[in-house]
From Swiss-Prot:
Alphabetized PANTHER family for the sequence: FIBRILLARIN, RRNA 2-O-METHYLTRANSFERASE FIBRILLARIN
InterPro entries in alphabetical order: Fibrillarin, Fibrillarin_CS, SAM-dependent_MTases_sf
Quaternary structure (record): Interacts with nop5. Component of box C/D small ribonucleoprotein (sRNP) particles that contain rpl7ae, FlpA and nop5, plus a guide RNA.
The protein's name: Fibrillarin-like rRNA/tRNA 2'-O-methyltransferase
One Gene Ontology term of the molecular function aspect: histone H2AQ104 methyltransferase activity
Length: 230
């Protein structure tokens, strides 16, 4: 059931100059035309529109926003390559943010991909791809253009995967969710972060967000391609 916002509580604020993202106190929401839950999230009504709660315990991008992410390269008409789409929890919110854009959602495991397919059937801007993100040449033909890459992959070679896709698609900006324990389970997380920053020296590092307490030893890194001016 939808609930009305009580304006006397926390003041609602649109984020990044877009009405598709709303913050009320410590809660995030994305505007949706579907009025349908994806993963059991709450739906509220605000300014004659429906908004789905975007939970930071279920989405690392939501966690980064609540932790103070200053820049949002994803706009209403952006084309996004999402690596590690899983069942589509965060993908669904990116779909809300970019209603006139495209989300190319890559997932290698069939079980979560089947749920991603169900989501894509309900949303015209999600293009699911059952493929290995290690091999971008296999899905290059399917992707017309990429403005932003978002990667959330639990593999030891996640940095190599990121750089391979950056080279293949040449986006202006990209998010890398760094999962340090997937790279080395015993090495200090900050040491892994430092080494990762060194490996990303060919890009402009714009922000590094520690995702704790939502995700321990996880970081979200936002980069721009060299030469991109803001």
């Amino acid at each position: 059931m939808q609930e009305k916002i009580r304006r006397k509580s926390s003041q609602p604020v649109y984020l990044y100059g877009m009405k598709n993202m709303l913050r009320i106190g410590n809660k995030l929401y994305t505007r949706t035309s579907k009025n349908k839950k994806v993963y059991g999230e709450d739906i509220i009504r605000f300014e004659h529109a429906n908004y789905r709660e975007w939970r930071p315990d279920r989405s690392k991008l939501a966690a980064a926003i609540l932790k103070g992410l200053h820049n949002m390269p994803i706009g209403e008409s952006s084309s996004i390559l999402y690596l590690g789409a899983s069942t589509g929890t965060t993908v669904s919110h990116v779909s809300d943010i970019a209603p006139s854009g495209r989300i190319y959602a890559v997932e290698v495991a069939y079980e979560p991909f089947s749920k991603l397919l169900d989501l894509a059937e309900q949303r015209d801007n999600i293009y699911p791809i059952l493929e290995d993100a290690n091999l971008p040449e296999r899905y290059r033909f399917f992707v017309d253009h990429v403005d932003v890459i978002y990667q959330d992959i639990s593999q030891r070679n996640q940095i190599a995967i990121f750089k391979r896709n950056m080279d293949e698609f040449q986006p202006r900006s990209a998010f890398l969710v760094l999962k340090t324990r997937s790279i080395a389970s015993t090495e200090d997380a900050k040491t892994i972060l430092r080494k990762t920053i060194e490996q990303l020296s060919s890009y402009n590092i714009r922000e590094v967000i520690d995702l704790s307490p939502y995700d321990t030893d996880h970081y979200l890194i936002l980069v721009d391609a060299k030469g991109v001016r803001r």
